[in-house]
Amino acid sequence: MMLVVSENYLLSPSLYLKALKLCSYQNVKKQLLLIHGNSITNGFCSNLQLKDMLIDLYLKQGDVKHARKLFDRISKRDVVSWTAMISRFSRCGYHPDALLLFKEMHREDVKANQFTYGSVLKSCKDLGCLKEGMQIHGSVEKGNCAGNLIVRSALLSLYARCGKMEEARLQFDSMKERDLVSWNAMIDGYTANACADTSFSLFQLMLTEGKKPDCFTFGSLLRASIVVKCLEIVSELHGLAIKLGFGRSSALIRSLVNAYVKCGSLANAWKLHEGTKKRDLLSCTALITGFSQQNNCTSDAFDIFKDMIRMKTKMDEVVVSSMLKICTTIASVTIGRQIHGFALKSSQIRFDVALGNSLIDMYAKSGEIEDAVLAFEEMKEKDVRSWTSLIAGYGRHGNFEKAIDLYNRMEHERIKPNDVTFLSLLSACSHTGQTELGWKIYDTMINKHGIEAREEHLSCIIDMLARSGYLEEAYALIRSKEGIVSLSSSTWGAFLDACRRHGNVQLSKVAATQLLSMEPRKPVNYINLASVYAANGAWDNALNTRKLMKESGSCNKAPGYSLVY
């Protein structure tokens, strides 16, 4: 419905105000400009009430330019005018403008009051501007607002948000009386800085002093419960919230579902979710993520996703990304394609880096390399994981040359590879026998990029060298990493198997000795060593190794036999 503006009706400020209220209900920017122009024509724009309402509506429309012009035309601007404008900027989220206006106010030598400080400190907090906030704190201490509850509360909120909990606690302890905002800011600050125990202690003190918590308090405490992974605390907080009358709060239910999922109780999370009439995006996302991490619960995740589509619940890229990860886990590229198609048709879903990476990963791990490449090339922005996922996909499916080409392109575009990128490349080299190039890549990782080799990297390079018969070189690498990186039994097993195939008795004994110290009851270790001895004609040693296997109490292995006799 459009607002009809006529000069015959807009004859007084009160009628202009009524017309502006209609604009605020209908969010009509065009009509707002029309009424503003009409008020100027008829000489009513100097009316302060009308001007204030115009400023508010312009800011709600995101039109900072017109709002600021109106403010600049106020002839006599006192502390009330400045504070009102700073407060509007802060309340509407225009925090840089609020800070800029506060500085102008200071230059014009207008003294701030507690409401000015409260608003500008809120902007500092939301922007994370600790330096500016501390400067304003200095002005507070010099003035007469230092003991004001609003100002103290704003200061501790700023320090808590910026991780300065000691300074926040000083403000908190110096307050003669504390409101709920102050308690919540402290509890949330401790939670955000991983001081969960202090959050719980402060909550106990809050209850002791007779302060009633709200949904925000419970939200912070539930996040603290996630930090310590304590299901018992989540249940206790749930019970207390119901007792205090917050059991039906949708915000609290969201927090509880998330906490139950992350503390390992999918059953309680599901029960809460099922009890709500309206499906909530955050709750659904938390449940889908939780179910995706349980191998036997993937069907439940699909049920929730289908339920969201049926009930037309708002969808986002996080949900779609989680569903694609499930498709990757269960190797269902068919369902993955359907979800991809749904995402393409939806106007709600933004194809961000995380979603693009999930698509690359799903298609690459399912062997659909062409689709993985298409998803990669269509991404507007890519991170190191995007490149690494496709490199790993090429390597996994034997496209070694393309993996190297993509790595070279990555280097050319100055995307810094990480340890997983090099692990994918080394794995590809190992499986395709590209020993020389693999060694060069390993050297690049260590000396050019300064990435320390993990056990997985060493396992790849040792396996690659050993497969190609470079047993001495592989063992030299093992020796050089003694005391730095502990090799797994699977790495030693691969090395022993390579030694056996290449008939190197001496290094077979070294590998077998290491394996037997790690897994003394595993028969395959004895059998491999005995096979090496037998292949080299050392029958006595082979027999002794078999005896050792029996004496160790290893699981019995059925003896080999022939049908020819």
UniProtKB/Swiss-Prot annotation:
Natural source organism: Arabidopsis thaliana
Keyword terms, alphabetized: Repeat
Family matches, as Gene3D superfamilies: Tetratricopeptide repeat domain (1.25.40.10)
Placement of PPR repeats on the sequence: 12-46, 47-77, 78-112, 113-147, 148-178, 179-213, 214-248, 249-279, 280-315, 316-351, 352-382, 383-417, 418-448, 454-484
InterPro entries tied to this protein: E_motif, Pentatricopeptide_rpt, PPR_At4g14850-like_plant, TPR-like_helical_dom_sf
Protein name as catalogued: Pentatricopeptide repeat-containing protein At3g20730
GO MF term set: RNA binding
Domain of life from the UniProt record: Eukaryota
Family, as annotated: Belongs to the PPR family. PCMP-E subfamily.
Region described as Type E motif: 491-565
GO biological process: RNA modification
